[in-house]
């Protein structure tokens, strides 16, 4: 009896496989293993193939600007907890560099929701660097000395090694004309924000998106490239 049932099941499976209704590779194709990356191949406007690497949570960029200036910037491609920031900042982020992204208030508020602190800036000390929090964002200057130029409820801005680094509150009003002019006239400007209105204004003013998450924008630079 059970032998007949098993035979019928096998025949049905064979039929489904033969007609391509059953794909034994579907599980591995839709769920990459831990050793696989989520890289993608895209066709650009010039019909050339570009490989886009998405297997890391921190992008490492080298930006050329000014008179032979090179700035090293690390951008978190997803929100990180304070513990993650300390770990990435200690293990992956090199010296003489800037590290920024979105922070979670790990252990203070919910670890599953981004920070909503009303404080303009808060500084947390790590072993060999400080973590500055601005609204739901963070910035780390590792081995470089920044000069703070703007700090208000909507924007935090520094100058470091002839490059402007700016964080824009994701919940603030759209950028004013004065703010846009100030950002445009700067030498090299890196803006990090999740503010959709601000992102649109930056794109309209010819800022370039430089990370996969589309939260980092660059202007007045010579070139940039992602490092391994």
Swiss-Prot record:
Indicate where this protein is primarily found.
virion
Taxonomic superkingdom = Viruses
InterPro entries xrefs: Baculo_ODV-E25
Function, in words = Plays a role in the production of infectious budded virion (BV) and occlusion-derived virion (ODV) formation.
The subcellular location is: Virion membrane; Host nucleus
The entry's cellular-component GO terms read:
host cell nucleus; membrane; viral envelope; virion membrane
What is the protein's given name?
Answer: Virus envelope protein E25
Gene of this entry: P25
**Which organism is this entry from?**
Autographa californica nuclear polyhedrosis virus (AcMNPV)
């Amino acid at each position: 009896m059970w032998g007949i049932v098993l035979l019928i099941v096998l025949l049905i499976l064979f039929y489904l496989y033969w007609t391509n209704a059953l794909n034994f590779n579907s599980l591995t194709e839709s769920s990459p293993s831990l050793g696989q990356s989520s890289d993608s191949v895209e066709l650009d406007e010039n019909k050339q193939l570009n490989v886009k690497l998405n297997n890391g949570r921190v992008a490492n960029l080298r930006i050329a600007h000014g008179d032979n200036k090179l700035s090293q910037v690390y951008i978190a491609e997803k929100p990180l907890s304070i513990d993650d920031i300390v770990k990435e900042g200690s293990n992956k982020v090199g010296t003489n560099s800037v590290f920024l992204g979105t922070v979670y208030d790990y252990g203070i508020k919910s670890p599953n929701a981004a920070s909503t602190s009303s404080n303009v800036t808060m500084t947390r000390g790590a072993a060999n660097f400080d973590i500055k929090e601005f609204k739901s964002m963070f910035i780390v200057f590792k081995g470089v000395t920044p000069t703070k130029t703007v700090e208000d409820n909507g924007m935090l801005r520094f100058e470091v090694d002839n490059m402007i680094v700016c964080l824009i509150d994701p919940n603030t009003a759209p950028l004013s004309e004065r703010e846009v002019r100030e950002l445009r006239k700067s030498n090299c400007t890196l803006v990090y924000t999740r503010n959709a209105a601000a992102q649109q204004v930056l794109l309209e003013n010819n800022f370039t998106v430089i990370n996969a998450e589309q939260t980092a924008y660059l202007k007045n630079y010579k070139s940039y490239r992602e490092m391994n």
